From Swiss-Prot:
Gene: ndhE
Entry similarity comment: Belongs to the complex I subunit 4L family.
Enzyme Commission number(s) of this protein: 7.1.1.-
Protein name: NAD(P)H-quinone oxidoreductase subunit 4L, chloroplastic
UniProt cross-references to NCBIfam families, sorted A to Z: PRK05715.1-2 (NF004320), PRK05715.1-4 (NF004322)
Keyword Signal: no
Transmembrane segments: 2-22, 32-52, 61-81
Catalysed reaction equations from the record: a plastoquinone + NADH + (n+1) H(+)(in) = a plastoquinol + NAD(+) + n H(+)(out); a plastoquinone + NADPH + (n+1) H(+)(in) = a plastoquinol + NADP(+) + n H(+)(out)
Organism in which the protein naturally occurs: Aethionema cordifolium (Lebanon stonecress)
Highest taxon of the lineage: Eukaryota
UniProt keywords, alphabetically: Chloroplast, Membrane, NAD, NADP, Plastid, Plastoquinone, Quinone, Thylakoid, Translocase, Transmembrane, Transmembrane helix, Transport
Gene Ontology terms: biological process: ATP synthesis coupled electron transport; photosynthesis, light reaction
């Protein structure tokens, strides 16, 4: 695959995730957009690793670490959202003032 096509696709994914993260009012949607941003970054790691240094797997291994950290982040984030929903009955970002009290 051509490098420019993959980079354009990754940039689209990154900016869709960034737009969703900025405009989202739901916590679950914000977590999904954050995961989309991390996947776009992972796509760049794998692409540059394959394009520039095909003999070593540095980008691929770094991508595996990022996926593991993103999975832990998603689990912790969903646990926090679940706890906030149990207490407040809402997952809207602008309605959660749990830390202010």
């Amino acid at each position: 695959m051509i490098l420019e096509h993959v980079l354009v696709l990754s940039a689209y994914l990154f900016f869709i995730g960034l737009y969703g993260l900025i405009t989202s009012r739901n916590m679950v949607r914000a977590l999904m957009c954050l995961e989309l941003i991390l996947n776009a970054v992972n796509m760049n790691f794998v692409t540059f690793s394959d394009f520039f240094d095909n003999s070593q797997l540095k980008g691929d291994i770094f991508c595996i670490f990022v996926i593991a950290i993103a999975a832990a982040e998603a689990a912790i984030g969903l646990a926090i959202v679940s706890s906030i929903y149990r207490n407040r009955k809402s997952t809207r970002i602008n309605q959660s003032t749990l830390l202010n009290k």
